[in-house]
């Protein structure tokens, strides 16, 4: 398949959703505009969508991280499909929290697009703590003047709850933070006003 001129492999049968998160395509295109000259970290990279948009946006370096070896294999295939053996890209099979603990302020654009932290309301409290912890680590590690793209795809987490978790993380890290964009799913993923949970993708 092709998205905005970029080719990608997708596992239609065994992959998550359709094998490629098409609901993030507008957000990937937005990231491309900010990537020029930056050192980019794509956490929970899955098939590497944000990574190859960052590559096309002339990022200085792009590092893709996922705990799944299969996801990293697919990311590397997609990078090679578009950029051959471009040395700007490196991929790591490791837990996201551990990776963030071990880096030392080397990235000035970080993407946090984790799988759903909560699928049921009884998991909501733990999910919000998880979002706060993850974003706090990113705020602590990002370079001054850096840009963070952060998302939640948990239906049971409202936009307001996610924002509060991110704001709490910013306060905890004692970093000055401004919102540049409020992000969501594209128009072909409409939200029924009688089913607000349909607005499952929230981002800043």
Residue ranges and their predicted role:
Residues 106, 133, 147-204:
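C-terminal catalytic and target-recognition region of SAM-dependent MTase-like enzymes
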Residues 1-21, 29:
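Non-catalytic substrate-recognition/targeting regions of SAM-dependent transferases
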Residues 70-111:
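S-adenosyl-L-methionine
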Residues 47-60:
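Conserved SAM-binding loop of SAM-dependent methyltransferases across substrates and taxa
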């Amino acid at each position: 398949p092709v998205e905005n001129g970029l080719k990608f492999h997708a596992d239609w049968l065994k992959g998550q959703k359709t094998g490629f998160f098409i609901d993030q395509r507008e957000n990937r295109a937005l990231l491309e505009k900010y990537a020029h000259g930056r050192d980019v970290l794509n956490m929970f990279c899955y098939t590497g969508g944000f990574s190859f948009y960052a590559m096309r946006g002339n990022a200085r370096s792009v590092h893709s991280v996922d705990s799944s070896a299969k996801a990293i294999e697919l990311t590397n295939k997609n990078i090679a499909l578009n950029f051959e053996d471009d040395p700007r890209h490196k991929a790591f099979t490791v837990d996201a929290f551990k990776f963030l603990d071990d880096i030392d302020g080397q990235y000035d654009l970080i993407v946090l697009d984790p799988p759903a932290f909560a699928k049921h309301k009884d998991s909501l409290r733990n999910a919000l703590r998880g979002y706060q912890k993850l974003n706090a680590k990113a705020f602590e590690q990002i370079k001054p003047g850096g840009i963070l793209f952060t998302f939640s795809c948990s239906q049971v987490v409202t936009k307001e709850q996610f924002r509060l978790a991110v704001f709490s993380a910013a306060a905890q890290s004692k970093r000055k933070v401004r919102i540049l964009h409020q992000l969501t799913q594209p128009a072909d993923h409409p939200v029924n006003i009688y089913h607000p949970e349909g607005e499952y993708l929230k981002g800043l």
